[in-house]
């Protein structure tokens, strides 16, 4: 049995959750879900229409989705090391690099974001949103727990944080890449946009925080967390983690990383200091 926000995914015995979305009112599809065999429908309250005993109206249902998904799927994020990456730029690259590096170390790691949900680099998976809805997200994490996956790198978009798509997750590490003027049509102003990003650190209190020490807008992540925070810098040699570019060539980058774990020199096929 399963639960879903999409009536098209309902199968016999499943549960359908009907809420008012940003673009579509899921309550319009209650009859479709019932016809497909939904055992129960949880719905935000609506005008008095008797749709039968399988439809249960739940006040403020949207605010309970994270807890509902967490309990239904047996709290999968708590059984994983979940690394959530937010920022205007770099979420996809950083998440994918984390996944690749963990796999090279012999670990089982998944990535979720713009490129879809993947356990292997190059794996093509259709994705509608950078960050899936909270039900789909927990379903995916639970599936990976069953497969023995240990690590997941997740893109945490400002829209997802604002729309509670990550509610109920246990975040092991939070990463804040940078902040530039974007999505102001949705958030209204830069302060609201930054505050949406900072929800990852204020609301989820990750065990570890990594932020761009060269961008003042990301330092709120350090201030929001009582847990260890590492600032990464390309210009400040006294930063927690200092990256010194030694050479840039047509074949890639050569750089040194100075960190609390020691110093290493790396040759990379990546181009551009932004990486």
Language-model features: locations:
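Short strand->helix junction
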Residues: 22-23, 182-183, 273
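Structural signal for conserved beta-strand scaffold positions within catalytic alpha/beta enzyme cores
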Residues: 18, 43, 57-58, 84, ...
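Adenine nucleotide phosphate-binding catalytic loops in nucleotide-utilizing enzymes
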Residues: 53, 187-194, 198, 223, ...
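N-terminal leader/targeting and accessory segments in enzymes
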Residues: 1-67, 71, 216, 242-244
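Short, acidic/turn-prone active-site loops that include or flank metal/cofactor-
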Residues: 60-63, 178-182, 233-237
């Amino acid at each position: 049995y399963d639960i879903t926000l999409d009536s098209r995914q309902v199968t016999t015995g499943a549960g359908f959750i009907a809420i008012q979305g940003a673009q579509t009112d899921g309550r319009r599809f209650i009859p479709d879900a019932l016809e497909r065999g939904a055992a129960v429908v949880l719905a935000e309250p609506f005008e008095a229409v008797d749709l039968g005993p399988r439809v249960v109206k739940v006040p403020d249902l949207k605010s309970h989705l994270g807890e509902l998904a967490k309990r239904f799927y047996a709290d999968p994020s708590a059984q994983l090391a979940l690394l959530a990456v937010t920022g205007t730029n770099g979420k996809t690259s950083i998440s994918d690099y984390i996944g690749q590096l963990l796999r090279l170390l012999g670990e089982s790691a998944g990535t979720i974001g713009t490129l879809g949900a993947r356990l292997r680099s190059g794996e093509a998976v259709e994705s509608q949103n950078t960050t899936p809805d909270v039900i789909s997200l927990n379903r995916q994490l639970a599936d990976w727990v069953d497969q023995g996956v240990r690590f997941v790198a997740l893109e945490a978009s400002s829209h997802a944080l604002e729309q509670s798509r990550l509610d109920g997750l246990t975040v092991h590490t939070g990463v804040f890449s940078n902040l530039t003027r974007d999505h102001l049509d949705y958030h209204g102003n830069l302060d609201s946009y930054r505050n949406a990003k900072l929800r990852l650190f204020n609301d989820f209190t990750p065990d570890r925080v990594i932020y761009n020490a060269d961008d003042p807008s990301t330092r709120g992540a350090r201030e929001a967390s009582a847990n260890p925070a590492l600032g990464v810098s390309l210009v400040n040699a006294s930063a927690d983690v200092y990256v010194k570019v030694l050479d840039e060539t047509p074949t890639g980058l050569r750089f040194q990383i100075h960190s609390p774990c020691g110093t290493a020199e790396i040759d990379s096929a990546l181009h551009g200091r932004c990486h």
